[in-house]
Amino acid sequence: MAAHILVVDDDVALAEMIGIVLESEGFTVTAVEDGTRALDEFHTDAPDLVLLDLMLPGIDGIEVCRRLRRESDVPIVMLTARSDTADVVAGLEAGADDYVPKPFKPRELVARVKARLRGRDESAEEHLRLGELSIDVAGHVVRRGGETIALTPLEFDLLVALCRAPWKVFTREELLEKVWGYRHAADTRLVNVHVQRLRSKIERDPERPEIVITVRGVGYRAGTGS
């Protein structure tokens, strides 16, 4: 079944262009023009991915993102003006997985969407341990003792990438390629914000992390978790 993409943008011409591009790649697309309709459509049709403009009439994109993330781990990709540095960070902190700066090339947009929708190999069983954490890779489940820790798919992929290579120090650029599937030109905010989000869920004290360790001037590595 074709993946269903919800496009939320008040620029009707742009939304129409995005729809044409994605449908040519085999996706089904629904487009809405404001935040209220986006939330309604999400609850009605349960899309597989949301393309979300930050500047919307009424409920803005950041608030829409925040509300969606409270109830779902659906991939969210922001559409934003290239100069909106503060908005990009705010959107990522609200729960977005990725962003595409405007203007963008159609193939770039398609690559972002496919990266976030990439399939997982459910047949290969793999279990990882890091300190108190037990990670069921095929089941996408993280536990500490009897407690299940809820992570978004992207947060889970980030944790697994680090845990599969314990003590290896990953640069932010390596993580962008390994986890997101591509490199952003001189932009590591995606990694930094998602590391913060991941730490807030898996660390006993996010201010003194023991699972995801910062190596200053280089990047991140898995710690002992103890």
Positions of PLM-derived features:
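Acidic catalytic/metal-coordinating carboxylates
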Residues: 33-37, 60-63
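Active-site beta3 strand of CheY-like receiver
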Residues: 45-51, 56
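Basic, amphipathic DNA-recognition helix from helix-turn-helix-like DNA-binding domains
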Residues: 57-60, 66, 70, 75-129
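Short hydrophobic/Thr-rich beta-strand motif most characteristic of the beta2 strand and flanking loop
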Residues: 26-34, 41
